[in-house]
Amino acid sequence: MPEIHPFSCYCVKPEWAVEVVTPPYDAFSPAERSAFVEEHPGNYLNVIRSLDEFEDLQAPSLERLLEQNAANLRSLLASGQFAWSEKPCLYLYRLISGEHEQTGLVCEIPVDAYAAGQAVKVHEQTRRDKEDQLLAYMETVGAASSPVCCTYRHQAAIDAVVRDVMQSQEPRLDFQSVDGVR
């Protein structure tokens, strides 16, 4: 199991969650994403626009698109829809869709553990050009908008802590998204 660390971040304020929280990125075709952002200018999806959403003749350069994504992020943060968490935290999340429910932990994991092949196992072959685009996004926009999901073998101690926290604390956010997921 890799080391995990709490982190500080901007969290959407509860009253803005339905408008701001992005449906699953890969649930949309590029054309659907483009239409969605036009209809939902306050949605975080406007911060993670990609070149494949544009017709070839209308596509901006990658540099220009990333600058626009950064401007969209600054606009969202300036709008008062997010609050900064001063104290580094670990975050639990629970998603419920129909009969399916999943719970996870949002935390930081040192990149070194992944790069060294320790604890975090590579599960897919990634394309170098996409890795370079993601790095350019993080450097230009200044946000980690593509978290990596990790799983772990069942550990009763972890499950007990998660259960205790969920039973003893009210959720910071509790809403149903535009795609019906709570």
Can you say where each PLM-predicted feature lies in the sequence?
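A cross-family signal for N-terminal binding/gating loops and helix N-caps
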Residues: 1-182
